[in-house]
Regions:
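Glycine-rich phosphate/ribose-binding loops and adjacent secondary-structure elements
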Residues: 163, 172, 176, 184, ...
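Surface-exposed helix-capping loop/turn segments at secondary-structure junctions
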Residues: 172-182, 246, 352-364
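Non-catalytic, usually N-terminal nucleic-acid engagement modules in DNA/RNA processing proteins
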Residues: 1-183, 296-299
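Hydrophobic alpha-helical packing residues
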Residues: 21, 162-169, 209, 238, ...
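Conserved, mostly hydrophobic/aromatic
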Residues: 21, 54, 89, 131, ...
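Non-membrane alpha-helical structural segments and their capping/turn regions in soluble enzymes
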Residues: 121, 125, 152, 156-163, ...
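Glycine- and acidic
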Residues: 147-152, 156, 216-222, 331-334
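C-terminal extensions of enzymes
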Residues: 1-15, 23-32, 39-40, 143-149, ...
Length: 376
């Protein structure tokens, strides 16, 4: 059950009760594509860095190790030893962006595995079946993510097909949740708004899917090449047409500034690979902006990455030491940077929730954005 606790302007402070625990929103979901966050991060670590929700990928887990194997082992939560909510994306984005030789038809998509080249078919029913086998807390509907440079005619046809696929997802999810051997009979389903950069197509699609009584609504197809200004314009157009009493999820976004701007526009679920990907390359977030620990100026820097930060890296190690590890290609350096970045994001979300509770989010947002422009 989703409870809207407070609003400041369009910004939402809410709570989603799930079978795997409570999600306080706005929330940043930590991305563990193949049931692990890249950077040697364990589920024990995730507890320590204040992770509420882990996100895994349907396509990748279907290809390897196989969703039927995970089901036989009791579902994804048992498989990875994680006792909090998991969201699985539908696999659609990977099918359309990674897979070669794809062929889109009304029934679904034919494509070749990126691992062994074998031919795979995935449609709405197959995506729901895979996610049901995984037993995630939240399943995402199967959709097509049209390119931001696709023609208006193509985008409209794609969105219409995505709407038809969404109804099939909903029907199949209801069937799967009623089966005796299902891993999670309380699995939630989020639909996805598409429409590339065409505001009117997105608005019409948002209004259509809002009538389908889903558990949550995502905005997909952003952060794939359009400018930040275009993204914010689309959010301004679309979010008012989605139910305020349901989760609003902006997929694949983004930077701390993106998140702050999107929260102010009514979004309360986020995910992005930035904190872990940047961390693996020595780029770490601070309240004064992002820094590159490979830079020579940190060679003798005995300070933690961020003064006052309580992450495992900042509590115990200096910038100079972590820089040394990165230069020596020691895995610990990468791991410490990833842990710090995820902790930074999770802590920022905590601060956003506190600011909304206190009715001072706009002030917090402006102060945070101004601070991140500073040089360190």
């Amino acid at each position: 059950m989703y409870t809207l606790l407070k609003q400041e302007g369009r910004a939402k402070r809410a709570r989603l009760e799930t079978v795997h625990g409570t999600i306080e929103t706005p929330v940043f979901m930590n991305v563990g594509t193949v049931a692990a966050i890249k950077g040697a991060v364990s589920t024990t670590d995730l507890h320590e860095i204040k992770t509420q929700v882990e996100l895994s990928n349907t396509y990748h887990l279907h290809v390897r190790p196989g969703d039927h194997i995970i089901k036989q082992l009791g579902g994804l939560h048992k498989f990875m030893n994680w006792d909090r909510p998991i969201l699985t994306d539908s696999g659609g984005f990977q099918v359309f962006s990674l897979a070669k030789l794809r062929k889109i038809k009304e029934e679904g998509v034919y494509f070749n595995s990126h691992i062994d080249g074998r031919k795979i078919f995935m449609g709405p029913e197959e995506s729901m079946q895979i996610q049901s086998n995984l037993g995630s807390t939240i399943a995402m509907a199967f959709d097509e993510c049209p390119s931001s440079v696709a023609s208006r005619e193509y985008v409209q046809a794609s969105v219409d097909r995505t709407t038809r696929w969404l109804q099939r997802c909903k029907d199949e999810m209801a069937r799967l949740n009623s089966l005796e051997d299902t891993v999670n009979p309380h699995q939630l389903l989020f639909g996805i708004n598409q429409g590339a950069i065409y505001d009117d197509i997105r608005i019409a699609h948002a209004e259509t899917i809002s009538q389908m009584n889903l558990d949550g609504y995502a905005i997909g197809g952003l952060a794939v090449g359009e400018t930040h200004e275009e993204m914010y314009r689309i959010l301004d157009s679309v979010v008012p047409h989605l139910p305020v009493d349901k989760p609003t999820y902006l997929m694949g976004v983004g930077t701390p500034a993106n998140i702050l701007e999107a929260v102010s526009r009514g979004v309360d679920f986020f995910d992005c690979v930035y904190p872990s990907r940047n961390g693996r390359h020595g780029h770490v977030y601070t309240n004064s902006g992002k820094i590159n620990l490979f830079n020579a100026k940190y060679e003798l820097d005995s300070r933690p990455i961020e003064e006052g930060c309580q992450c495992p890296a900042c509590r115990h190690y200096s910038r100079a030491y972590i820089r040394h590890l990165l230069k020596a290609k020691e895995m610990l350096g990468m791991r410490l940077c990833v842990l710090h970045n995820l902790y930074f994001y999770n802590t920022m979300m905590e601060e956003i929730r506190d600011a909304l509770d206190q009715g001072c989010f706009e002030e917090y947002k402006n102060r945070k954005l101004e601070g991140m422009q500073a040089k360190k």
